């Protein structure tokens, strides 16, 4: 995704902490005018958001987009549910994974691609507490090894 024309607005780092992200897909999102202006200003929070499939459509819940300052009476509800745009085949594939395998749809990133807001949707499996502790231990061990090699190269 290091292509020109893509500007990452917000990352959901908590998703990588709480879930194993097994697959990622790109989805468009239906927004109002003041919502896209707030997103371009970077006033969006993905932290507690999730997606759900209802009647063959994918909906995004709890995505907080702050009201636009100059929006006056045309401003939007910050937490309204928003429809995601996916191909029919992608939705059918997601239905099977979510219902039978017990996976969850979590937005991992929101970005602008050629002027359009896109959401990177992760198909995720929840982590248990011992998985989180194991990840933290691995990260600390890796950091310690890198520190050791860095100091060894300096001659300490």
UniProtKB/Swiss-Prot annotation:
GO CC annotations, alphabetized: cytosol
Alphabetically ordered keywords of this record: Cytoplasm, RNA-binding
Cellular localisation: Cytoplasm
Primary localisation category: cytoplasm
Gene3D superfamilies: 2.40.280.10
UniProt GO molecular function: RNA binding
Keyword Kinase attributed: no
Entries under Pfam families matching the protein: SmpB
GO biological process: trans-translation
Function: Required for rescue of stalled ribosomes mediated by trans-translation. Binds to transfer-messenger RNA (tmRNA), required for stable association of tmRNA with ribosomes. tmRNA and SmpB together mimic tRNA shape, replacing the anticodon stem-loop with SmpB. tmRNA is encoded by the ssrA gene; the 2 termini fold to resemble tRNA(Ala) and it encodes a 'tag peptide', a short internal open reading frame. During trans-translation Ala-aminoacylated tmRNA acts like a tRNA, entering the A-site of stalled ribosomes, displacing the stalled mRNA.
HAMAP family: SmpB
Family as reported in the entry's similarity comment: Belongs to the SmpB family.
Protein name: SsrA-binding protein
Lineage, highest ranks first: Bacteria, Bacillati, Bacillota, Clostridia, Eubacteriales
